Every structure is written in structure tokens, then in C-alpha cells.
Regions:
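Nucleotide-activated donor-binding/catalytic signature segment of Leloir-type glycosyltransferases, i.e.
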Residues: 229-248
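A short, well-ordered alpha-helix in the C-terminal region of glycosyltransferases
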Residues: 302, 309-323
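Charged catalytic cores and adjacent phosphate/nucleic-acid-binding surfaces used
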Residues: 342-368, 372-383, 402-409, 413-441, ...
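C-terminal alpha-helical cap of glycosyltransferases
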Residues: 302, 326-347
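Carbohydrate-associated surface elements
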Residues: 43, 158, 177
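Conserved donor-binding/catalytic core segment of Leloir-type glycosyltransferases
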Residues: 6, 186-212, 220
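Membrane-proximal helix-turn-helix segments that form the acceptor-binding/catalytic region
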Residues: 130-152, 159
């Protein structure tokens, strides 16, 4: 099934950049696989900006949409994306109806970060360079971003290890890719290409010294980055040494096609190495060259004097490049995208077999005096719930099941439905509520073990306040791994200090098609019913899950300061007794 894919790059599309070359290459190959691919990027080219505005105004599926003018990106700056660019990004995401949003270098304060943070599509993040990981500076913001990323990708082990320190998770390392159609072996001549920029000066000097011992050979200093000064070339070699700009792929392809030997810079571009390999050049890239530049000169001399060795290295390099073509990389990304599809559940709003049942209000999260921080007696709670017009309540005491069992017994003969549950504290991953339980589940187990214990009792896994960062919550990686085990996600908890935590839970539930739950988390009688669902009446866990398909979240908040003060007063009275 074809996917609608959005690739977001923070770098100006109008300027050469290694990330943009990667994005352009995989976009082409993903389209060849049948997907609809749109690239969102800034640009400094007027024609790009005009075409981008036109595409947004018409809602067209353009291959590339320039959503605003390019602005400099600093690794140390705060987020400085203009309001107009943010508005265009939001509009493009809405109109695109994307299945996957893939952001590149989201560790920069840029549109890639915003796209992954604000999208409700499946999110993939790619990291290229360790030095582009400074944003966001606050850990809470990084965790928030991680919660919205479904797959982490890096183009090297070094990048993956550096990114994992800031954004922990399971990384898939893929190649930067190379265009094996553009970069092909040509008629080779005695030409040595040296990648030249500020970090490669010692290697370049050593290579030029070796040129004196290699009659008939020429050297091209290929500038892959802008230089402020022209390199010094010995007077006796000026007719054999040339300087070329290699910032554009087409220019590099012409130079590398006829190069017999290529000397990559120790801190240079990974892409240039792949392009040289695709062009069939022998690489003079010995280990330790950064500390001992003379090793590069020795490697050049050996390759220049041994044609058979050059030919063998050339064939090996070409074979390596073909295994890392953009087509291969796109195939790997396609597999990643498709593997994420199973995380989303189909949204079903059918009336189903419960259409004839009456509507009731259900508060799915509350406590009794069996909890250590609550003083509500079971009978008081049942009477108050009925007085508030609730048709169903879930008793979810902290790490104890006695209150729920007592409530079920005391509710016999009442019209009120009581769901026996327990709010279980895991080892370090927050809390999990089990509904429709039969016995107590011990605290302190891992998240997965707690879920398994609920399943053993054929209970319903209800995840409360999953993004309340004022307390312990599941790690983003845990949430993604356990998605298939979550039956209900609490999207509204009336006791949360910041409403943004509820909004984040609602976004998460919508993104993955999870059934929504709501509860008051009441610890005092006045809080009962402040968060609830309007749903069809049910009997048992099966009908409960069916009823959730058509349920509506009701927010009936009261002052949190008022409710919290009542809780503290009740706790003080209990201590005085």
C-alpha cells in the first residue's frame, strides 16, 4: 500500500548540503517505490518560494514545497523559526495528510524539530552529525520530542552513539546513500583528487610533497566547503596542481569519474568517500592519518606505483558503493515506514451491538480510604457517585485491591456499575491501572511484567496520566514498545497541574488510534466526576471495550488548589486521629 511521506530538512534547498542530497536521493527512490513524497524545506531562491506559496494555496501535492526563506541555523541558538514559516509548516502538514513525517537533524532549532513535535503522523528522525544535537537544551523537551518519534535513524555509528546520549532509544544505522547513476567510473587517468578544507591541510601538504616523486601524475584539490584563503601550492608543482570547487554533486561527478586515486579528508564528508567509491576510484585512506599525515603520502605512492592494486581497489570500491545506493537506502527506509504501520489502530466509530443501551457517565479513576493518601470511605464514595449522576466508576486504589473488592460487594443492589481495579506502581516507569481485576497485583515490577500480570487476570490495561512529568511516567521507548498492550489511554485526568499533559495524551491517543479514557483521579468526594466518559452502558470487560468506541470525553474541572487543599486537610485530620 503506497504511503504519503513528508521529508523535512532544516537546510536551505537552494544551497548545496549533504543532508539535502540525501533527502533528494531517497525522495526520488521512494517515489519509484510508489509512494507520494513531499519535501518541506526553507529556500533562498525566489522561484522556490513563489512555487511553495502557490502549492500551499492550491493544496497541491508538490515534490518540494519551500515553506519560507532560509535563515541561519546556530547550534547554540534558541528556536528562531519565524511565525510565517511556522504557519506554512502547519498548513503543509494539515493539507498533506501524511502517513509518515521524517525529520532530518531535529537536534537543531529548526522546522525539522517543529514538524516532529507537532505532527500526529508516524514520526522518524535521522541524525547525521554529532555536532548538530544541541537542541532542545531542556531534558523535558527532549523527552517530549522522543515521545512523538517512532523510529530513530543515524547515518553512522558515531552519530548514533552521540545522538543516543541526548535522545535515548534504539537506533537503526543506514548509509547516507549515493547516486550510482550520476557517479560512475569514467576513463581513468593519472589524477589524484584530494578533499580540501580547513581540517585537511596537513594531509594535503603531505600529499603534495609526495607528488614530487610521482612524475606524470596531477592533483586536484577539491573544495567541498567554502574556504577563506587559497591553499599554498609549491612553485614547481603549479602546472600539475589545480583547485576545483566540489560543492555541487554534478561537479564532483565529473572530477571523480576520471580520478584514479582519491584522498578523503580525515574529518571530511562521508558522502565524498561513497561518491569516490561509486566512481571507481581507489581510496588512499589509511587509519591514523589524522595524527600522522605522512601515512596518506605513503598510501598515495603505493597506489600510484601499483596499477594492479589500484584496479582491485577500484572494483571493491564500486561494489561497496552499489550496496549503499539511494535505491538500497530507500528500500531500508520503506521497510522502517511499513513496520511502523502496525502501531496505529483503525478508528472504529460504529454503533455496534450496544446502540440500544442507555448512555451513562463513567469515571474511570478514583480512590478510597484503602489508598494511603485518601480518606474516602467506600459507602460514602458510592452514595456520592450516584448523587453526582454517575452510572459507572472504577475503584483504582494505589497498590491495593481491597477497596475495589469492598466496593463491588457494597454496590450489589445499586444501579451503579463498579469496575474493580488497582493503580499499580512499577519499578521506575510510572503507574499502570488494571481494570476488571480479580486479585491484587504487587507493586515494584517492571512495566511489561505489570501488564502481563493484568493480562493473567483477563483485565483491561488502562494507562493513567502518561505524560504527567511532575511524577514518574513511562519512558518514550517503553510506550512505543508496549503500544499493542495498551487497551485504554487516559487522555483527561482532572488532577493534573498542567493541562498540556492531557493535551499531549490526547494527541498520542489520536495518533495511534488508542481508545480514550478519562477520570477524576479523585482523592476527596468533591473531586468525583470531574473527569468522565459519556458511554453506553456495559457489562464486563468485552462490552466495556466495545462501548469505548463511541465514548465521549467530558471535562468538568474544579479548582485544583481547592481539591488539593481538601486532600491535605483530610490527611492532616487522619494523622491527628
Amino acid at each position: 500500500m503506497p504511503l504519503r511521506i513528508c521529508l523535512v530538512t532544516p537546510f536551505a534547498w537552494s544551497q548545496p548540503h549533504d543532508v539535502n542530497e540525501h533527502v533528494s536521493g531517497i525522495a526520488k527512490e521512494l517515489r519509484n517505490l510508489g509512494h507520494t513524497v513531499t519535501v518541506l524545506a526553507p529556500s533562498g531562491r525566489t522561484t522556490d518560494l513563489i512555487a511553495g506559496r502557490r502549492a500551499l494555496a492550491r493544496g497541491d501535492d508538490a515534490d518540494v514545497i519551500a515553506i519560507g526563506a532560509a535563515i541561519p541555523i546556530s547550534r547554540r541558538s534558541s528556536l528562531g523559526v519565524p511565525v510565517g514559516v511556522r504557519a506554512n509548516l502547519h498548513l503543509a502538514m494539515l493539507q498533506g495528510r501524511f502517513d509518515v513525517v521524517h525529520g532530518f537533524e531535529p537536534g537543531l532549532p529548526s522546522i525539522s524539530y517543529l514538524a516532529l513535535r507537532d505532527s500526529e503522523a508516524l514520526g522518524v528522525a535521522s541524525f547525521f552529525a554529532p555536532e548538530r544535537l544541541g537542541y532542545p537544551p531542556r531534558r523535558s523537551l527532549r523527552e517530549k520530542l522522543l515521545g512523538r518519534i517512532d523510529a530513530l535513524v543515524a547515518t553512522s555509528r558515531v552519530a548514533a552513539e552521540a545522538a543516543a546520549e541526548r535522545f535515548p532509544g534504539d537506533y537503526r544505522v543506514i548509509s547516507p546513500g549515493v547516486d550510482t547513476e550520476l557517479f560512475q567510473p569514467g576513463a581513468k587517468r593519472k589524477l589524484i583528487v584530494i578533499e580540501f578544507h580547513a581540517g585537511s591541510l596537513p594531509v594535503a601538504r603531505a600529499a603534495l610533497r609526495s607528488l614530487r616523486e610521482l612524475p606524470g601524475w596531477e592533483v586536484v584539490l577539491l573544495r567541498t566547503k567554502a574556504l577563506s584563503t587559497r591553499p599554498g601550492i609549491p612553485l614547481g608543482l603549479r602546472d600539475r596542481v589545480h583547485v576545483r570547487s566540489g560543492r555541487k554533486a554534478a561537479t564532483r561527478a565529473v572530477v571523480l569519474a576520471e580520478a584514479a586515486i582519491v584522498v578523503p579528508a580525515p574529518t571530511g564528508s562521508t558522502r565524498l568517500r561513497l561518491e569516490a567509491a561509486a566512481a571507481g576510484a581507489a581510496l588512499a585512506d589509511p587509519p591514523g592519518v589524522l595524527d600522522q599525515p605522512e601515512l596518506a603520502a605513503a598510501a598515495i605512492a603505493r597506489l600510484a606505483e601499483d596499477e594492479e592494486l589500484r584496479t582491485r581497489r577500484s572494483r571493491e570500491a564500486r561494489a561497496l558503493a552499489e550496496s549503499q545506493s539511494f535505491a538500497t537506502v530507500a528500500g531500508e527506509l520503506d521497510a522502517i515506514y511499513r513496520s511502523l504501520g502496525g502501531r496505529r489502530r483503525a478508528r472504529r466509530r460504529d454503533t455496534g451491538p450496544l446502540a440500544a443501551r442507555p448512555w451513562i457517565l463513567a469515571d474511570l479513576h478514583m480512590h478510597t480510604s484503602w489508598s494511603h493518601d485518601c480518606s474516602i470511605e467506600v459507602d460514602e464514595l458510592l452514595d456520592h457517585a450516584e448523587a453526582e449522576g454517575l452510572g459507572a466508576i472504577a475503584i483504582t486504589d494505589h497498590n491495593v485491591f481491597g477497596g475495589a473488592a469492598e466496593a463491588v460487594e457494597r454496590a450489589r443492589g445499586r444501579d451503579l456499575i463498579v469496575i474493580p481495579g488497582e493503580e499499580v506502581k512499577t519499578d521506575d516507569q510510572g503507574e499502570v491501572i488494571g481494570l476488571f481485576l480479580r486479585e491484587e497485583i504487587p507493586r515494584g515490577m517492571s512495566f511489561s511484567e505489570t501488564v502481563a500480570a493484568i493480562r493473567e487476570q483477563e483485565g483491561v490495561v488502562y494507562l493513567p496520566h502518561p505524560f504527567d512529568r511532575m511524577h514518574a511516567i513511562p519512558f518514550p521507548t517503553t510506550l512505543h514498545r508496549q503500544l499493542h498492550e495498551i487497551d485504554v489511554l487516559e487522555v483527561y485526568n482532572a488532577r493534573l497541574l498542567f493541562e498540556g499533559y492531557n493535551d499531549e495524551a490526547l494527541r498520542f491517543a489520536r495518533k495511534y488510534g488508542l481508545p480514550a479514557g478519562a477520570g477524576s483521579d479523585a482523592h476527596v468526594l468533591q473531586g468525583v466526576g470531574t473527569g468522565a466518559l459519556r458511554m453506553r452502558s456495559f457489562q464486563g470487560p468485552e462490552e466495556f471495550l466495545l462501548s469505548l468506541r463511541t465514548a465521549e470525553v467530558l471535562r468538568r474541572p474544579k479548582s485544583l488548589a481547592y481539591l488539593q487543599s481538601l486532600k491535605w486537610v483530610a490527611q492532616v485530620k487522619e494523622k491527628v486521629r
